[in-house]
Amino acid sequence: MKYLSIFASVLLATASAYGQSGESCRTASDPTLQKPELYAGYDCVNLLDSTAVTVQPTGSGSFTVCKIVKVMNTRGAVANRILKYDYDPLTAHAEFHRVTIYKANGDVINLDITQQQDYAAPARAIYWGARQIMMEIGRLDPGDIIDYQINKKGFTYALLTGGIGNDESRFIPPMRGQFYDIVPFWTTEPTVRKVYKVNIPMEKEMQFQFYQGECTSSMRYEDGRKAYTFVSTDIMPTRREPNMVDLFDAAPKLMMSSTPRWQDKSLWFNKVNEDYGSFSAIPEAQKKVDELIQGKKTEMEKIAVLTHWVADNIRYSGISMGKGEGYTLHNLKMNYTDRCGVCKDIAGTLIACLLYTSDAADDK
């Protein structure tokens, strides 16, 4: 009875706090009380994982991230003693809006959000100046429920633009007026309800595809705008296997774009990089390509040797080139000199090398 009353309090509080977000912020009853055997051994359970996005005509989005987490044991208590959220300061701003702890003994604690901290995020392989907002919760006990909301403004993909500043234009995506997102629908903890809702201007269209799984989707008209909602329930952690592909290629995910065709994003990306000179020739690279393809008779032999050389010699390491990082490739001279880059730069290096071969260039 004690736990039922605590969860009832959570529902009442979230219904009030999330009233304007509608479907994206509703949650189901606590199944850890109804089916405890299903969640035995898990450190924590996400009762709700919800994101609601309001898209502006420029393509910039205002994100409301709502999460309700139940602590199941002492390991879960330790893991959740500090809340963390990653963001890119060059394209977004994020802050905790509200954090409430519903204690197993019936106490309700509203944390002082002015105590939140903003630190440089730990980095490995990619060093683009990512940040983390953090909120210290302190001691938790099994049965406690954490209920918090994060507000974020900006965009998610196409990554970095110009320098940091107070200019609101930094929140507008490089492909101005277009919204694009990839939303993982897999989890690392059991999740009772996961929701992604995006609200766009009436004049915009949105195409979407759900891969490697199923969800419930709907489109409604709300206050002169279109609202797309995607819901998945009773999600269990995705099991990994040795040497399996990345979860983006194996687990449930949602992809969406406001462009008329999927190809429009790629065509825009290609033009940006051709205009920038990402594939411009340099003598030392031409010399290396001539050396590698010497004696190779067929087009596929040339493609194979160049692909292997790029894979072996351009290491994965993301060093920011400043303005344009994230949606503009590092040019060939930079990649060939530094012998490193992220996935887009490695692919760009291979494309540039293929352009040096007359017969392979047509299939670059």
Where are the regions that the model predicts?
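Long, intrinsically disordered, low-complexity accessory segments associated with secretion
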Residues: 307-312, 316-336, 346-352, 358
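Lumenal/extracellular ectodomains and adaptor appendage modules
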Residues: 20-190, 261
